[in-house]
Regions:
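Intrinsically disordered, low-complexity segments enriched in serine/proline and basic residues
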Residues: 24-30
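Extracytoplasmic thiol/disulfide redox context detector
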Residues: 1
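N-terminal polybasic/positive-inside topogenic patches
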Residues: 32-34
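N-terminal juxtadomain amphipathic helix
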Residues: 4-24, 36, 43-102
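Conserved Radical SAM active-site core
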Residues: 69-167
Length: 167
């Protein structure tokens, strides 16, 4: 279900809680910690992944729509969920004379922190993760698929690639 999908989204990196005394990437208290204790308040968080620096209230998302504040903890809704995978010639990428003639294993997730007026990939970049139902794909499986297709390059493309970064 949609709730399970969001609940199971991995904890994102590159954020900080805006709770008093909070530290980067960690809520100031763990929800439900200790038996019989009152659940601490959830706080807004600030995403530090890109230059937007989105301040995200509980239940809200950043401008890219790929990160969500779930009970005071930032979650990545796109990690391991590429919506498109293609093998492209490396020359299609904005890389000058890098491995000429090689294949690039290209993948993208939904979402983008930018709203470029003439984006040729707007159907992917301006959509939200729940617009596509895709199974979870582990990074090792992506690398194996690239090897099987004899693609020495993995390219995060079709949208701003920082939205996929979670390590």
């Amino acid at each position: 279900t949609k709730d399970d999908w969001m609940r199971l989204a991995p904890r994102a990196r590159y954020w900080r809680t805006l709770a008093p005394g909070g530290a980067d990437g960690r809520p100031s208290a763990s929800p439900g910690e200790g038996r019989g204790k009152r659940r601490p308040e959830a706080w807004p968080v600030q995403c530090l992944l890109c230059a937007q620096g989105c301040v995200i209230p509980v239940g809200g998302r950043g401008r890219c729509r790929t990160r969500m504040n779930v009970a005071g903890e930032l979650r990545s809704l796109v990690w391991g969920r590429p919506v498109t995978i293609h093998v492209d010639p490396i020359e299609k990428k904005p890389l000058y004379h890098y491995l000429p003639g090689a294949a690039a294993f290209s993948l993208a997730t939904t979402g983008c922190p930018q709203s470029c007026q003439f984006c040729q990939n707007w159907e992917i970049s301006q959509s939200s993760p729940e617009d596509y139902r895709v199974p979870l794909v582990q990074p090792a499986a992506i690398a194996e698929k690239a090897r099987a297709r004899k693609a020495p390059v993995i390219a995060f493309t079709y949208n701003e690639p920082t939205v996929l970064r979670n390590t």
